[in-house]
Amino acid sequence: VPHRVDYRPVEYESDMPAVLAAADLVLCRAGATTVAELTVIGRPAVLVPLPGAPRDHQTLNAKGLVDAGAAVLVKDADLDGDRLTAEVQNLFEDPVALEEMGESSRTMGRGDAADLVADLVGRVASGEAATREHDRG
């Protein structure tokens, strides 16, 4: 029995962590924050980089997940209903591979990123980070 795809378009959702946590597969752009969120919660994705993004940074973001086996990349120009259906169907036909993609995604995540940034800001504010950089030089 083929897996039934339950697709629910919404105009706006304020609780994206809950939406992502409920998803089996995420179709999205490949902005840095989105990619980071996917890896923290360990979700597989079909990533469609935004065309015209400065220095094509979204494609670079996507390639990190693709290379790790956590996502599939589809160029915006190649995305239509048939292509999307094929990508989603291929992924849902192999639930083990889909689960492995999620695990690959999770291994890339840094759940402690906010703490690391706060620590760095504190060290910079106290002059400690500048001293460490000077000592390395």
Language-model segments: what does each one mean?
Residues 1-137:
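Nucleotide-activated sugar donor-binding and catalytic core shared by glycosyltransferases
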